[in-house]
Swiss-Prot record:
<feature type="modified residue" description="N-acetylalanine">
    <location>
        <position position="2"/>
    </location>
</feature>
<dbReference type="GO" id="GO:0000221">
    <property type="term" value="C:vacuolar proton-transporting V-type ATPase, V1 domain"/>
</dbReference>
<protein>
    <recommendedName>
        <fullName>V-type proton ATPase subunit G 1</fullName>
    </recommendedName>
</protein>
<comment type="function">
    <text>Subunit of the V1 complex of vacuolar(H+)-ATPase (V-ATPase), a multisubunit enzyme composed of a peripheral complex (V1) that hydrolyzes ATP and a membrane integral complex (V0) that translocates protons. V-ATPase is responsible for acidifying and maintaining the pH of intracellular compartments and in some cell types, is targeted to the plasma membrane, where it is responsible for acidifying the extracellular environment.</text>
</comment>
<dbReference type="GO" id="GO:0036295">
    <property type="term" value="P:cellular response to increased oxygen levels"/>
</dbReference>
<dbReference type="Pfam" id="PF03179">
    <property type="entry name" value="V-ATPase_G"/>
</dbReference>
<dbReference type="GO" id="GO:0006879">
    <property type="term" value="P:intracellular iron ion homeostasis"/>
</dbReference>
<dbReference type="GO" id="GO:0005829">
    <property type="term" value="C:cytosol"/>
</dbReference>
<keyword id="KW-0375">Hydrogen ion transport</keyword>
<comment type="similarity">
    <text>Belongs to the V-ATPase G subunit family.</text>
</comment>
<dbReference type="GO" id="GO:0005765">
    <property type="term" value="C:lysosomal membrane"/>
</dbReference>
<keyword id="KW-0813">Transport</keyword>
<dbReference type="GO" id="GO:0046961">
    <property type="term" value="F:proton-transporting ATPase activity, rotational mechanism"/>
</dbReference>
<dbReference type="InterPro" id="IPR005124">
    <property type="entry name" value="V-ATPase_G"/>
</dbReference>
<keyword id="KW-0472">Membrane</keyword>
<dbReference type="GO" id="GO:0097401">
    <property type="term" value="P:synaptic vesicle lumen acidification"/>
</dbReference>
<feature type="region of interest" description="Disordered">
    <location>
        <begin position="19"/>
        <end position="42"/>
    </location>
</feature>
Length: 118
């Protein structure tokens, strides 16, 4: 009977060691999965940052050319406004004098189509 209980003890110890090995293997597997997941996330993040950087560069190139056109149009508009202001200042007095002359200088005349019935 002692040999039987000794055999049972050996089986129990072997089962315990096997369970420990299985448990240790599961822990290693979980660590490897976790590490692989972290590496994959880091790689995805790096790729996303690279693509975002490329997008920003293309966006800046596209908007940069559009921005220079806008600046050019604004500059041209300011130049034209300056010219118009200069013309206005030069001709203002003359136009006002002519306008006042036409309004204030009234010469009554009989229209040529008017007939005197007599």
């Amino acid at each position: 009977m002692a040999s039987q209980s000794q055999g049972i003890q050996q089986l129990l110890q072997a089962e315990k060691r096997a369970a420990e090995k299985v448990s240790e293997a599961r822990k290693r597997k979980n660590r490897r999965l976790k590490q692989a997941k972290e590496e994959a996330q880091a790689e995805v993040e790096q790729y996303r940052l690279q693509r975002e950087k490329e997008f920003k560069a293309k966006e800046a190139a596209a908007l940069g050319s559009h921005g220079s056109c806008s600046t050019e149009v604004e500059k041209d508009t300011q130049e034209k406004m300056t010219i118009l202001q200069t013309y206005f200042q030069q001709n203002r007095d003359e136009v006002l004098d002519n306008l006042l002359a036409f309004v204030c200088d009234i010469r009554p005349e009989i229209h040529e189509n008017y007939r005197i019935n007599g």
